[in-house]
Amino acid sequence: EFGRTIYSQGKLTKTNHGRDHHSRCFTTWVAGGGFKAGYEHGQTDDHSYNIVKDPVHINDLNATLLQQMGIDHERLTYRFLGLDQRLTGVEGAKVIPQLVA
C-alpha cells in the first residue's frame, strides 16, 4: 500500500495539481466490527514524511481485519501461479491488539 505526500512536486497548474505516491506512510480507517471507536494509531514527523511512533505493516493490518471477520489469516490461502499464497505474506504477520475494542 502507499499513501500520498502532503506536498506537490513541480509547478502547480490547473492540470498539474496532484500529489506523489508516498510509500512510507498511509492512512486508513475502519468502523464497527469490534474496532475501537475514535482511536488513532501511529504518528508521523512534523512533515508527515517518516513514521515516528507505532508503525504498522499492511500485512499486520490485513491480519487484524481478517481476525475481526473470524478468519485465521495463517490458514486463508489462494492459489497464484501454482503456489498457495496468503494475504498476509509469509513473514509472520501479527494482529494489532491496540486496534481492537
Identify what each model region corresponds to:
Residues 2-101:
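Ligand-binding pockets and gating/stacking loops
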